[in-house]
Amino acid sequence: MKIRRATSEDLQQLYAFNHRMYPERLNYKEIIDFWIAKSPEAINDIIVVADDDGKIKGQQLFSSMSYYRDGVEVDGTWAFDLIVDEELRAGSQGFSLMWKCKKEHPHTMSSGSNDISMAINMKIGNKHIGDLKKFVGIANPLWLLTSVFRGSVPSNKFPQVLKTKGAIYQKIEHLENIPQIKESYNLQLLEYSRKLDFITWRFFSGLHDYALYKRDLSDDYFVVRTIVRNHVTSLVLVDYRCRLSDESNMDKIICAFKSLASKLKLGVLIVGSSVALVDSVCMRYHFKAVGRDRPILGMISCEDSDRVRETRNFILLTLADTDGEVTW
């Protein structure tokens, strides 16, 4: 067995391995293509376990993503989909894969590890620096019935303008109107970059049908799409950027988000939050935290990870930064 970086010659094997390991992902090819389309070198970020015949037996997927800390940009990666073949799980291949990944990608973060994986990650140097909570709210009880058996709502059915609480948001239809965010939005937080190349790849590459709304006279924005689970259509706040030093900025985004759901006659709303201020705004609008908090792990220096995790004022993470929303 060899643990190495993937190449373009491994693509068909990656398809086959992911189809076998994640049978519930009917669009597994599209998901892999989405990640490796980010850059010409993207497939080389992936670490695989391969036998002597080149058949893939394990993987850890990575996506290059830069982040800001204290206003300084750091090149890093996002890690996800760590899995090895059943026949290797009794041995040391899983740990060896994780150790190889640490050496190849020293500035990486991830979320959602189970208890066993998290314990191993902590032993090899990861810090538990936060948790991503999923909040669920109701836009209007009257729209719950109209959300059943409705299917996805295409973004071309979304309104062009949202007016709410002293703010106006315009839906962005053309790439030249995408916000030009070239630096950290919130200096007090570790925050992933939202440069033009990220926004273009993440929301305009066609994997899912997103709508991006930008606030007038500002680069504040939020991104939404609909998902269908158990025949119920929900509206998801996938991404957002605003100055979190002023709670009213996030309040305007949540208010506009709820207004959009009402215009679309959708009852269920979903928001991801890793920051106490966002938690507070969501709860003020009667959102409830549901499910298991997804631990955020990082190969970074952090003097008191217990404190920053408890205060939830260290890292800004949205559903767009994680791999989970991509598979919804």
Model feature map: region roles:
Residues 73-86, 232-244:
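Conserved acetyl-CoA binding element of GNAT-fold acetyltransferases
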Residues 48, 58-60, 77, 82, ...:
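Conserved GNAT-family N-acetyltransferase fold
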